[in-house]
Structures are given as C-alpha cells and as structure tokens.
Amino acid sequence: MKILVLTVNTRPSNNLEVWKNSASRNGYEYKILGMGEKWKGWAWRTQKYIDELQLQKNIDIFILCDSDDLYFTGSKSEFLEKFLNYKTNIMIGMEENCCTGDESQEYKNEVIRKLKKIAKEKNINTKYYFPNGGCVIGYRTPLIELLKENITAKDDQFGYTLLYKNDINKITPDYYQDIIGTCVQSIKFLEINKEWERYEDRVYNSLTNTYPVIMHFAGRNFNNYKRFLHSEDRKISFSPKIEIISYGRHLHDNLFLIVIILIIIFILILF
C-alpha cells in the first residue's frame, strides 16, 4: 500500500530538518505544503490538506501531521501493520489535558465530561481523552470528507473533538499511544513518573506499554522534544522559536494565566 505524509509548514527550520530526516530514515515519502506562504490559520491548513488529497488519487493512506514538534520513530512497515490492525478509516492522536477552542469554559467542561463518558462506555482505561489535531491518519476519501466537515472550525483540533463527540464512529482515537505518541508533560513530571522513557532510539510509554511510531511533543514541549530525539537528529540544532510563531495552538489557553502573572508583577513593582 502507498503511504504519503503531508504537512503544512511555511518556513525552513532546523526542526523541519529533524522531521524530514526522521521520515526519510524510516522509509516514509512526504510532501511539504505552504512553504514560503504566509500562515493563515487552522482553517487555511485544513483547506491545504483538502486540495492536496484531491490531487493524490494514487495514494492509499495519508498521514497529516505537524512538522516542527513531531518526528517519526518507527518504520513505515511497522506503521502500516499497526494501522491496518485497527481496521479503521481514520485515526487521530490523543492527549491528556488540552481541550482547545474559544468556547466558554462551561461548554468545554461539558465536552470533557462527554469524552470521558465515551471512553468509560468503551471500557477504555486511559487518561488520553482529548483529540490532538497535530496528527491525523487515514484513507483518502474518508479524510477528505472529515476535513470538509471541519473546514469551518477556527481551531481544527476542537473541530475534530466535536466531530468525534457527536459521532464516535467517525474517528478512531489512539487512546493507547500505539501509533501516535503525544507527550505534553514537563521534564520534571517525567523524571518522577517515568511515563515516557527513551530506550535506544525509541520512545516508550510505560502507562500503555507501547512504542509509538510517531512522537508528537505538543503544547510547545520543546525540552522533551529535544530530550527524546533520535541520536542522529541530536546533531541538528534545536530551534523552538518557530513553533511559538506558527504552531502556538495551546498559547491562547494560557493567555488568562499570563495576564494574571503580568498583573502580579506590575503590583509588586509598584509596591
């Protein structure tokens, strides 16, 4: 089966070189969309994916993913074997503590309760409840249909969340980090809890007992991204500034906290 990795990235960076190296090393073919263009938001990225998928009629499976905070750890053959075992049209990465979007916290809490209820009803023992838009995998036609449904979402990640909440058969969550590992924890947390560990050049999740073939360090988790890099990629300088500009999805979730901190600092200066 033919597999193609698609990413949208508007500028060269060392992080992108890590992504490219990891894809090539593990046997994946890839295409970068949007290079040299101005970043215009998540809906724009969704449309980029739709346009490319409509052109790529000879590819069986697509991996749509970030490329500034993500890299491949397992081979294409391992990926294919795992994905086919799920017998699903679409799979999405999952994380434990991020419900994005500009909706009210009350509404988000309702969504969170629903996501946890879905997992419980499926007898899924996990803490990874929340879809992460940084890696979506699937077959061409179902992906196009999903992306078209999600095109109006200002935040594509929250859009995927609502689509899954309203129809649990539409997307298969990678609850156990089997294919897509999403690491958002701090280094201090990992040192204490050992949730994610590095064995040679693979990353292991001790909670799910899995070795993902794709690792995504979401939420500007640059320190762990660098910490878990493949030995060959450690030779490439790490440049976190790119993600803050282009992929600051989690940034708006922390704006309130940032404002409070600034107010406290201002008061301390005055007194």
Question: Where in this protein do the model-derived segments appear?
Answer:
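Generic preference for well-ordered alpha-helical elements
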Residues: L16, A43-T46, D69, T73-K76, ...
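Short, aromatic/basic amphipathic alpha-helical patches
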Residues: L16-R25, S104-R113, R227-D233
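Pan-eukaryotic secretory-pathway lumenal catalytic ectodomains of glycan-active enzymes
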Residues: E195-F266
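Short polar catalytic/cofactor-binding loops
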Residues: V8-S13, E96-C98, R220
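N-terminal anchoring/stem segment of glycosyltransferases
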Residues: M1-I61, N85, L251-L268
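Catalytic core and acceptor-binding pocket of nucleotide-sugar-dependent glycosyltransferases
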Residues: I124-R227
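Short beta-strand-to-loop acidic/aromatic patch adjacent to the donor-nucleotide binding site
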Residues: D60-D68
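Conserved donor-nucleotide/metal-binding helix-loop-beta segment in metal-dependent transferases, i.e.
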Residues: L70-E121
